[in-house]
């Protein structure tokens, strides 16, 4: 908050003092005494000058002789003025007293003016010259701005770290989903491998069964061949030559042997061909499954390494985020302490400014009192000079006396201009000015 106090301006207005100033003259002849003068009041209250004993002219002055309650005072030309010499002497004494008082007050006024000027020179720059405070305020503004920038930078870094952590979390979740999918594929391939192994074992068992059956068939065939040969041999000994020519058993056996051998070879070839095709198919599938399994294992190891690196990076980002949050809390704490210190400094400066204003007002009031007293004394001196100068006319009116006693009533206008500025992040967001006139 910056506040400035405008310089004082003095407006002097002239008006009759009939309402604020009165000259009371009373007398009882022939007793004479010196006058006692009292100065009081400031500005509009004026000063009252009373003379307790002053020579008048018989009953023409009306006993009391109150100038404040009459509009005019008429001096009768037929009245006899006695003791004029004593009256003039009394007036001269009073005039000398007034002149001495005026000189004394002028000297006191000059001394007070010098003191006021010195006080203004000493205290004035501290009130109006805010260069020292502006330097401190500028440094504090720079510090606040730097702190705000650092705070914004830290907030941005925290946001970036949070976004990076979110990205890594998304990547980690995606990689985890891929890993789970690969694991499920590997489990499926393992089931396929198990099924393939079972099929291979079944085929091998079937091949063994077929081999045993082939051996059994060969053995039976040999047994049948041997039995047939024995039968043929036994039958050939008892052949009746006269019997009609029968079927050639050797040819039949050869035909049967050829048919059985062809059938056996065909079955053997079909079995071997089927076995080879199945074995080749299972070998191809096994190779493919092995390659897929190896690829899946490689991908799984890569995914594990990537997940491990992502977890390490995530932990580092978490630790960096925690450190940044700690730094942010420390910065906010320092910022709050600095703002509290600045608030205390501003309050102290405002208190000093209020004290300076109070001192200035008090000095101004003292100056006004002295100035009013001086001007009233000058007005009274002018009035007495007018009275001492004498009038040739027989009539002296109170209006003439009051017209000679017109003085300028001093009015002091104090204008206080208070400018309030609201700062946010080193920038002025609100500016208001209040002017107060006293």
Curated annotation (Swiss-Prot):
Key words, A-Z: Coiled coil, Intermediate filament, Keratin, Phosphoprotein
Tissue expression pattern: Expressed at low levels in skin.
Region described as Head: spans on this chain: 4-83
Any one GO biological process: intermediate filament cytoskeleton organization
Residues that span the membrane, as ranges: none
Region (Tail): 394-438
Sequence segments annotated as region (Coil 2): 253-393
Pfam family, one: Filament
Region span, Coil 1A: 84-119
Region feature Linker 1, mapped onto this chain: 120-136
A cellular component term, taken from the record's GO annotations: keratin filament
Site (Cleavage): 242-243
Region feature (Coil 1B): 137-228
InterPro entries reported in the protein's UniProt record: IF_rod_dom, Keratin_I
Superkingdom of source: Eukaryota
Site (Stutter) location in chain: 335
Function: When phosphorylated, plays a role in filament reorganization.
Family, as annotated: Belongs to the intermediate filament family.
Note: There are two types of cytoskeletal and microfibrillar keratin: I (acidic; 40-55 kDa) and II (neutral to basic; 56-70 kDa).
PANTHER family, per database record: INTERMEDIATE FILAMENT, KERATIN, TYPE I CYTOSKELETAL 18
Protein name: Keratin, type I cytoskeletal 18
Native organism taxonomy: Eukaryota, Metazoa, Chordata, Craniata, Vertebrata
Gene: krt18
């Amino acid at each position: 908050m910056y506040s400035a106090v405008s310089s004082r301006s003095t407006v002097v207005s002239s008006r009759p003092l009939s309402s604020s100033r009165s000259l009371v003259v009373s007398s009882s002849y022939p007793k004479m005494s010196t006058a006692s003068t009292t100065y009081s009041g400031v500005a509009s209250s004026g000063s009252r000058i009373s003379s307790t004993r002053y020579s008048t002219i018989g009953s023409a002055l009306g006993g009391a002789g109150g100038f404040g309650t009459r509009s005019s005072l008429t001096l009768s030309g037929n009245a006899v003025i006695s003791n004029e010499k004593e009256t003039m002497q009394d007036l001269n004494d009073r005039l000398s007293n007034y002149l001495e008082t005026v000189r004394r007050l002028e000297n006191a006024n000059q001394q007070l003016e010098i003191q006021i000027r010195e006080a203004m020179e000493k205290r004035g720059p501290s009130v109006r010259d805010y260069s020292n405070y502006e330097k401190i305020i500028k440094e504090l503004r720079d510090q606040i701005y730097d702190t705000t920038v650092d705070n914004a930078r830290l907030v941005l870094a925290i946001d970036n770290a949070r976004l990076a952590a979110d990205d890594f979390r998304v990547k980690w979740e995606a990689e985890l989903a891929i890993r789970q999918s690969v694991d499920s594929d590997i489990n499926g391939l393992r089931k396929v491998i198990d099924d393939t192994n079972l099929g291979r074992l079944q085929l091998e068992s079937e091949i063994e069964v077929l081999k045993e059956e082939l051996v059994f068939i060969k053995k039976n065939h040999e047994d049948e061949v041997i039995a047939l040969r024995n039968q043929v041999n036994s039958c050939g000994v008892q052949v009746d030559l006269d019997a009609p020519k029968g079927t050639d058993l050797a040819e039949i056996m050869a035909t049967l042997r050829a048919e059985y051998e062809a059938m056996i070879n065909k079955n053997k070839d079909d079995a071997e061909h089927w076995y080879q095709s199945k074995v080749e198919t299972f070998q191809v599938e096994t190779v493919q499954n092995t390659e897929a399994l190896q690829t899946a294992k490689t991908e799984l190891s890569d995914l594990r390494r990537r997940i491990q690196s992502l977890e390490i990076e995530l932990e580092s980002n978490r630790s960096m985020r925690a450190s940044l949050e700690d730094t942010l809390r420390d910065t906010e704490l320092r910022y709050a302490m600095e703002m509290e210190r600045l608030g205390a400094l501003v309050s102290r400066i405002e208190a000093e400014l209020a004290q300076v204003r109070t001192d200035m007002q008090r000095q101004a009031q003292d100056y006004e009192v002295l100035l009013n007293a001086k001007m009233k004394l000058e007005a009274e001196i002018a009035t007495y000079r007018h009275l001492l100068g004498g009038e040739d006319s027989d009539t002296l009116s109170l209006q003439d006396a009051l017209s000679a006693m017109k003085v300028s009533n001093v009015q002091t206008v104090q204008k206080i201009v208070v400018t309030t500025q609201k700062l946010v992040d080193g920038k002025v967001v609100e500016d208001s000015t209040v002017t107060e006139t006293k």
